[in-house]
Amino acid sequence: MKVVEVKHPLIKHKIGLMREGDISTKRFRELATEVGSLLTYEATADFETEKVTIEGWNGPVEIDQIKGKKVTVVPILRAGLGMMDGVLEHVPSARISVVGVYRDEETLEPVPYFNKLASNIDERIALVVDPMLATGGSMIATLDLLKENGCKQFKVLVLVAAPEGIAALEKAHPDVELYTAAIDEKLNDKGYIIPGLGDAGDKIFGTK
């Protein structure tokens, strides 16, 4: 599995700001969007382009355009919604597929509860977004669902990943690509990433 920890100074700076314990909902939400945008820039760097001639201000001009990529952005509910706008800044024509998976706080197992996928998903590359890759269970369940519906190409974008989650994802889905702003130290006994960001969903939505 391809794992990319994006080490651009802007990303490192912004993810550092997100670690502040008493960060406001507004600021956390803004930073999640910004880091999601920067991760998308990195994740789409291998998209092929083709030459197209358009009518410019002074006659025909040849330009580069993305070549035939159909994209679906897949936020995992609910926290993934906090990264979605940042992704759409770069691929505004992408279709949105929504998958609902929550983690049982006692068993730490993923529990799927909702999905609404884009049409022709078998022809699309999926940019799957979720702020945290902790145990990997929610991401694995989402990728299982996408594959069951015919999707074949995946790029996973997360703000912070734990080594345990990376290992689990690689074992279950070695064909995906993972882009993360940070690989943290470990999971604690409750399955939270250390040092992590805290509960990203609560911080994005202002709930507890």
Curated annotation (Swiss-Prot):
Molecular function terms from GO: GTP binding; magnesium ion binding; uracil phosphoribosyltransferase activity
Catalytic activity, EC: 2.4.2.9
Claim: Isomerase is one of the keywords in the record: no
InterPro entries, A to Z: PRibTrfase_dom (IPR000836), PRTase-like (IPR029057), Upp_B (IPR034332), UPRTase/APRTase (IPR050054), Ura_phspho_trans (IPR005765)
Superkingdom as given in the UniProt entry: Bacteria
Activation and inhibition: Allosterically activated by GTP.
Enzyme class: transferase
Pathways involved: Pyrimidine metabolism; UMP biosynthesis via salvage pathway; UMP from uracil: step 1/1
Cofactor mode of binding and number, as noted: Binds 1 Mg(2+) ion per subunit. The magnesium is bound as Mg-PRPP.
Catalysed reactions, semicolon-separated: UMP + diphosphate = 5-phospho-alpha-D-ribose 1-diphosphate + uracil
Protein keywords: Allosteric enzyme, Glycosyltransferase, GTP-binding, Magnesium, Nucleotide-binding, Transferase
Gene3D superfamilies: 3.40.50.2020
Binding sites annotated in the UniProt record for 5-phospho-alpha-D-ribose 1-diphosphate: R78, R103, D130, P131, M132, L133, A134, T135, G136, G137, S138, D199
Chain positions recorded as uracil binding sites: I193, G198, D199, A200
Pfam families: UPRTase
GO biological process, one term: UMP salvage
UniProt cofactor(s): Mg(2+)
Similarity annotation: Belongs to the UPRTase family.
Function in brief: Catalyzes the conversion of uracil and 5-phospho-alpha-D-ribose 1-diphosphate (PRPP) to UMP and diphosphate.
UniProt-recorded name of the protein: Uracil phosphoribosyltransferase
